[in-house]
Amino acid sequence: MNFTVGFKPLLGDAHNMDNLEKQLICPICLEMFSKPVVILPCQHNLCRKCANDVFQASNPLWQSRGSTTVSSGGRFRCPSCRHEVVLDRHGVYGLQRNLLVENIIDIYKQESSRPLHSKAEQHLMCEEHEDEKINIYCLSCEVPTCSLCKVFGAHKDCEVAPLPTIYKRQKSELSDGIAMLVAGNDRVQAVITQMEEVCQTIEDNSRRQKQLLNQKFETLCAVLEERKGELLQALARVQEEKLQRVRSLIRQYGDHLEASSKLVESAIQSMEEPQMALYLQQAKELINKVGAMSKVELAGRPEPGYESMEQFSVIVEHVAEMLRTIDFQPGASGDEEDDEVTLDGEEGNTGLEEERLDGPEGLH
């Protein structure tokens, strides 16, 4: 579902409300999305309950939450585009919630509950000339005013314009800004989803490498147990460093998304103000906030291959005198398990060089 139009048409228009409602229909239950709303990797949305129904139907042997049996996940196809969705052991509860869509649904329901154009149009009166309506806009001072103020009042030397002209201009400017923010929110949501997948890949790769280490160290004697602990600690340290970095980025992107969504909601509510003068009193500040939010630069994502843990691949050779020199091979690609480890000391050096575990470039 794509909401990048940013509510450019006002929600107060009945035709546009009908069009928006069509975009908020779940393809499974054919009703308006019910919270929580989850977003699939293909960027389509479903009620979490509906997603769970489809998932359970596609995976009849999968154990639901609360079961004592540990499940390995499952898969199902998106009902909108048929893209295959692969889930982890958490099932549909591991899918990201689409808070933006949930906020839009709340706003839509609020708008639908009240009659259109319920507020009678009123005119603000000039504070200096109580019998004069505010009907022009001072471009120099950037405030609404009345005709008498222009003729012989405080704004007689200022440049002015008709109130409706400035009203339409600034409303269009704010609407365009909202569209940019909503489009940016979609991109941020996609980035968050991708980085969560990176976290999962890091954990999967780390788990695989730990299993390989354990399998190979089981064949060695007690002296290997000490070294195995050292290597596992190094792997876990780098894993934690990587996960902390990616999770920190996820929190940063999430905070930006939340702030941007709140600003979008505030701007949309401001656009619903039917009084031009009241609207213009707060429009400039909102426009500035929207512009500033649109220019916020987020921290870069992890570089390609950041999730790889292949540098921790090892292979065990039965050379007892070199056991204590086993170390992770710097820059190991992990393509062939037979090349996963090097034995320091082949030239006669059998000393334990533990300082290489503290900070080799291949581990960072």
Swiss-Prot record:
Residues 334-347 have a biased composition (Acidic residues). Residues 328-364 are annotated as: Disordered. Keywords: Coiled coil, Cytoplasm, Cytoskeleton, Developmental protein, Differentiation, Metal-binding, Microtubule, Zinc, Zinc-finger. GO terms for biological process: cell differentiation; innate immune response; negative regulation of microtubule depolymerization. One of its GO terms (cellular component) is microtubule associated complex. A zinc finger (B box-type) spans 121-163. It is found in: Cytoplasm, Cytoskeleton; Cytoplasm, Myofibril, Sarcomere, Z line. The keyword Coiled coil applies. Its main location: cytoplasm. PROSITE patterns: COS, ZF_BBOX, ZF_RING_1, ZF_RING_2. Zn(2+) binds at C126, H129, C149, H155. Residues 168-211 are annotated as: Mediates microtubule-binding and homooligomerization. Pfam families: zf-B_box (PF00643), zf-RING_UBOX (PF13445). A zinc finger (RING-type) spans 26-82. One of its GO terms (molecular function) is microtubule binding. Residues 271-329 form the COS domain. Residues 353-364 have a biased composition (Basic and acidic residues). InterPro entries: COS_domain (IPR017903), TRIM/RBCC (IPR050143), Trim54_Bbox2_Zfn (IPR033492), TRIM54_RING-HC (IPR042752), Znf-RING_euk (IPR027370), Znf_B-box (IPR000315), Znf_RING (IPR001841), Znf_RING/FYVE/PHD (IPR013083). Residues 194-252 form a coiled coil. Homooligomer and heterooligomer. Interacts with TRIM63 and probably with TRIM55. Interacts with tubulin. May bind and stabilize microtubules during myotubes formation. This is Tripartite motif-containing protein 54. It comes from Rattus norvegicus (Rat). The gene is Trim54.
